[in-house]
């Protein structure tokens, strides 16, 4: 009998909504990275083997890098990149684009929700993440509006477990 794989998806804010912005040396960002790694380790110990990242700037990229770094210790874990459309990174800085491509090069799979940009492709990506996970790990500041909030509500509507880390604390 084939063993069922448990899946965790990530959702979280982009840098403009994070207290540290793009400054990953800020103590609040360092603390969030530690909290994310601790939570990911805990999920692996609970049997989660597959991690889904939407690969947006901010929390998605941070979480994806943590999963990749933990693969040396936990070779059973997989990173699946769920992209809203081909070329989502083209308007980003050169450094962010390089980071994005480095993660994609190490991913176990890449899934495009759409090949081209469409009005709802980000929402569709977020719904895909929630629908294809057992657990949603969210870095969320409590604002009602926005993609992170909508993804959390959708996962809850589906009856999935949601773990929230607050970037303001």
PLM features: residue spans?
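Acidic/glycine-enriched connector segments
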Residues: 1-169
């Amino acid at each position: 009998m084939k063993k069922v794989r448990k899946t965790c998806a990530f959702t979280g804010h982009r840098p403009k909504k994070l207290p540290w912005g793009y400054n990953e040396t800020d103590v609040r960002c360092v603390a969030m990275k530690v909290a994310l790694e601790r939570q990911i380790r805990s999920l692996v110990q609970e049997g989660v083997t597959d991690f889904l990242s939407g690969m947006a700037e901010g929390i998605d990229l941070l979480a994806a890098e943590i999963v990749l770094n933990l693969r040396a210790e936990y070779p059973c874990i997989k990173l699946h990149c769920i992209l809203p459309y081909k070329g989502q990174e083209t308007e980003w800085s050169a450094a962010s684009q390089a980071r994005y491509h480095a993660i994609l090069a190490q991913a176990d799979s890449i899934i495009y929700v759409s090949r081209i940009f469409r009005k709802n492709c980000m929402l569709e990506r977020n719904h895909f993440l929630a629908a294809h996970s057992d657990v949603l790990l969210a870095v969320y500041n409590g604002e009602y509006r926005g993609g992170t909030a909508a993804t959390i509500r959708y996962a809850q509507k589906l009856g999935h477990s949601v773990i929230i880390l607050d970037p303001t604390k």
